Amino acid sequence: MTYISKKQAAKKVIVREKPILVRLKLIIGAGTASMTPPLGPNLGQYGINSIEFFNDFNTETKELFETGLALRVILWINVMKAFYFELQMPKISNLLKEYYKVECEAAKGGNVYIEKERLLKDCFKIAILLCTFNKAEKQWEQIEKKYLRITVLEILGTCRSCKIYVKKAENE
């Protein structure tokens, strides 16, 4: 799934008028793009205005994601050095690791145990993000409940593959 803002959609029309020079696939932390290597030199070799890219990227991603979350970005550059970028949905495993960073670091044996309510709440947050990623104008009432339920079940399956399990209650 890709997301392109209205500003980037307008730039896309301009960029696509000329032949495309390069399409770059990058992984950048949300709101943390800067001139430091490897990103700065990588953009510099194509001659684009990197300061403009960093400002655009940081302002758009700060609104949508937590700072530092690894995002996949596709950057299109044409022969006139004009550019636009598309954001791709972060991997679910990356989102889960971001939510449970402290627990993953403290885990023994690689298995992470989370309370049932917290795990379901976080899975619903990720599912809502997935359902609304392409359609930023969608609100909670517009999300179809059956797709949300299916998405939550998929995320719970991803939790299992990432070794994130439900903590058993002590009274059971």
From Swiss-Prot:
The lineage of its organism: Eukaryota, Amoebozoa, Evosea, Eumycetozoa, Dictyostelia. The gene is mrpl11. The keyword Ribonucleoprotein applies. The keyword Ribosomal protein applies. It comes from Dictyostelium discoideum. InterPro entries: Ribosomal_uL11, Ribosomal_uL11_N, Ribosomal_uL11_N_sf. One of its GO terms (biological process) is translation. Keywords: Mitochondrion, Ribonucleoprotein, Ribosomal protein. Its main location: mitochondrion. One of its GO terms (cellular component) is mitochondrial large ribosomal subunit. Belongs to the universal ribosomal protein uL11 family. GO terms for molecular function: large ribosomal subunit rRNA binding; structural constituent of ribosome. Pfam families: Ribosomal_L11_N. It is found in: Mitochondrion. This is Large ribosomal subunit protein uL11m.
